[in-house]
Amino acid sequence: KTEKDHNENVRAIQKEILKNGPVTCGYQVFDNHYDDSGFSSTGSYYDTKGDYLFSHAVSIIGWGTEQVNNISIPYWLCRNSFGSSYMNAGYFKMKRGSNFCLIESDVWAAEPFAVYESDL
């Protein structure tokens, strides 16, 4: 994909979250993610170290930007399935906009529909 294609994909993910809520994504887990040594004190994961271990799925619930060493880093806000004892009450941040750990390549969204009592 070109950078333009990738930027359009990021915008599509953001639009989907705004319109219908969280999306599910798969991403690559490396040693320093699995043992938590790659996370900053704010629960941010921006650098891989070690071997690729496996793929994992989380929900992307939002996005933002934070300052790290006077550098503005865009991130996805992710909700893990490990429960509230993981990271920041079950949430963590992953670098946004660079397809970090392939997080922006493997995204799914459900199509919402309404069920009415008269349909039951």
Regions found by a protein language model. Give the residues of each.
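Predominantly the structural core of cysteine protease catalytic domains
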Residues: 1-77, 84-120
